[in-house]
Amino acid sequence: MECLRSLPCLLPRAMRLPRRTLCALALDLTSVAPPVAASGRRANLIGRSRAAQLCEPGRLRVAGEVHRFRTSDVSQATLASVAPVFTVTKFDKQGNVTSFERKKTELYQELGLQARDLRFQHVMSITVRNNRIIMRMEYLKAVITPECLLILDYRNLNLEQWLFRELPSQLSGEGQLVTYPLPFEFRAIEALLQYWINTLQGKLSVLQPLILETLDALVDPKHSSVDKSKLHILLQNGKSLSELETDIKIFKESILEILDEEELLEELCVSKWSDPQVFEKSSAGIDHAEEMELLLENYYRLADDLSNAARELRVLIDDSQSIIFINLGSHRNVMMRLNLQLTMGTFSLSLFGLMGVAFGMNLESSLEEDHRIFWLITGIMFMGSGLIWRRLLSFLGRQLEAPLPPMMASLPKKTLLADRSMELKNSLRLDGLGSGRSILTNR
């Protein structure tokens, strides 16, 4: 009863409280319910304690704060448990390989990067963050530091042979890398760019023979009709070629963006800013920015060659498409011409068939009595139809013939001889004047 009496005083205060605090208080009030068989004194004490809790606004704030604190703890624990785990493969300067798993939060804290820097993107890019080089190549992500190379999440990829056989030897200097005398990041960048160029070259070498074989089969003049299965294969190969052209274009644009900015070239030389000895060598004679520019220009040239080869294939596909359309148009013209010839034959036959219609009427004449009249009339009908059909075909042939090129008007022989004689006279006059002048000058 005391609790009920205090409700009118507490309602205005409760309306000002947030909804979460009210829910917490409601759960607190209903969590411990007194038993039904409790004594009256115990019920009275419980009612007074609940009323005292309701009457103290400070307790309300504390309860709300405790509830919010518990919620934040639970959310942080949930986020920590759901944080992605990277499988990291580490390569040092000597080519030693170590693999381990690390959470994303721990990894970017160790590297001094932001969370957005380790976000996966399917677009090729080369960026520098906090003296770290981040290279993204569709499904491959690498972080290059002055001391090591980190490959992130190579799982479910066919990279084991390249990662564990070729890459360590290239980084340690045993491979055929041009940048072996330069700092470690040059070798790492060259190895990754070489791998990506080889991947694009492999895709092109697979597509090129398939496309050429399909085009040869479609453009072959021995086949009068076009095979639909070959067209479907050509369509699929054309889509793959378009994807390859897009990959090459993105690769070229990403490298060209770095080549256009001198600051980016300087930032890619991470050992220059972390190692004093490398900085002294760069200041003394070896310009690392120029070496990086030459390296990127070399791979840009290789990508440009791949782009030209892919463009040639695209031109061949377009030319073959026009040839296929021409062949289809010629076949369609042949069918239309045949249809027109049959129509003219039907017209000529029906025109002379009127003679048979006249004999089929119920008219009496003396011609039916002669047995030779039937064969005579039939012969006249077929001969007349054949003659008219031939005339119509000759008319159609004259109309469909290609027009001859205009003939050039030929000059008569007399004018040509006159022109030659005039040229000879002029040359003789010039020679005579020249000899006379020479004699005068000698005298």
UniProtKB/Swiss-Prot annotation:
Activity regulation info: May be regulated by calcium ions.
Transmembrane segments: 340-359, 371-401
Protein residues bound to Mg(2+) 1: E243, T246, D247, E312
Domain of life: Eukaryota
Location within or outside the cell: Mitochondrion inner membrane
Protein function: Magnesium transporter that mediates the influx of magnesium into the mitochondrial matrix and regulates magnesium metabolism. Also permeable to calcium, sodium and potassium ions. Required for normal expression of the mitochondrial respiratory complex I subunits. May play a role in maintaining the inner mitochondrial membrane potential.
Comment, domains: The GMN motif acts as an ion selectivity filter.
The family this protein is said to belong to: Belongs to the CorA metal ion transporter (MIT) (TC 1.A.35) family.
Protein name from the UniProt record: Magnesium transporter MRS2 homolog, mitochondrial
Annotated organism of origin: Pongo abelii
Lineage per the UniProt record: Eukaryota, Metazoa, Chordata, Craniata, Vertebrata
